[in-house]
Swiss-Prot record:
Organism, as annotated: Salmonella typhimurium
Sorted UniProt keywords: Cell outer membrane, Conjugation, Lipoprotein, Membrane, Palmitate, Plasmid, Signal
Lineage top rank: taxon: Bacteria
Signal sequence residues: 1-20
Name of the featured protein: TraT complement resistance protein
Gene: traT
Localization (cell): Cell outer membrane
Family: Belongs to the TraT lipoprotein family.
Lipid-acceptor residues (N-palmitoyl cysteine): 21
Membrane topology: Lipid-anchor
Amino acid sequence: MKMKKLMMVTLVSSTLALSGCGAMSTAIKKRNLEVKTQMSQTYWHDPVSERTVWLQVKNTSDKDMSDLQSLIAKDIQAKGYTVVTSPDKAYYWIQANVLKADKMDLRESQGWLNRGYEGALSGAALGAGITAYNSNSAGATLGVGLAAGLVGMAADAMVEDINYTMITDVQISERTKATVTTDNVAALRQGTSGAKIQTSTETGNQHKYQTRVVSNANKVNLKFEEAKPVLEEQLAKSIANIL
């Protein structure tokens, strides 16, 4: 009986320690804010003496990004360009739209989130195993085993790896001396089973390029209020560095 109790105490103690390992590891590794920005496509342009830019920033996400245009304009000006209010007077057009700025789970692709949850789940499972082994005190042992699992779950709940992602589509238009012909094709839905193909052709004096900028902010227990300024800063630098 004493040996069984000793083994039970040892197992429960080990469970309590292991259940908090995932949370402790997360807290240590993710204690500092990490920000990464990537662009889906590279935009190349020939060097020219013209250094005027017309900037248009839209936001179709559900987050407030009212300061974003001024931040981007400031970084563009820091590179020696003049931001103008009239598109007709600009050599470059930069148009950006924030599609989404929200919490996104990137840990599944990295295989990191699943390891974090194993601590709590193993505690609950081990509690059931102890109950089966110690049949003489099943009720008491079940309570201890469940408590071990709940401690692990509580620790994991208090320490959460949070990642916020901002997705922005960018279109760059560059004036050219050549005549540019653009063919537009659009498929318009007609009800649930049909579609209408709409085509048009236009001529102009601009080459247009499109890319997507994805910015991530990652930290333990991160709040959007903390992530927002660094996400905006990274996006502004990325767009300005196109020029």
